[in-house]
């Protein structure tokens, strides 16, 4: 069984298309900042793509403490297998306690695949998330 004390931090999968960040990235990083402040940890953006290091700094203005950039020509365009492998490898290595992925077409493909590979739960379409030491409260659209 995993030692959950090893897991620390709130991560946001930051989606880019053709070298531009998506508006959902900024919304998620802002929400992640609130969660991280409650949990007493850092916000990390995870940005995959080709030649995307230059756009990573934009996330700092919305609350990201740091951004991990996985830059490769193989990641220029989204492919399920490549992105899921990189995201899962990063999660397994660095162990964030929360990973936020936007409810976009890519997020709806990537999120469940990562959850299955990581043997963890997934909450889809949450509009608000409160975390405390003893509980998690989610708000879902009706």
Annotate each PLM feature.
Residues 136-142:
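Conserved small/polar residues in nucleotide/adenosyl-binding loops
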Residues 117-135:
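Short, acidic/small-residue loops that bind anionic groups at enzyme active sites
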Residues 58-79:
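A glycine-rich helix N-cap at a beta->alpha junction
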Residues 12-27:
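Short, glycine-rich nucleotide/cofactor-binding loops
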Residues 95-96:
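Proline-aspartate-enriched helix->loop->beta-strand connector
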Residues 25-36:
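Histidine-anchored nucleotide/phosphate-binding helix
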Residues 106-118:
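Short Gly/Thr/Asp-enriched flexible loops that form oxyanion-binding sites at enzyme active sites
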Residues 44-49:
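Short internal beta-strands
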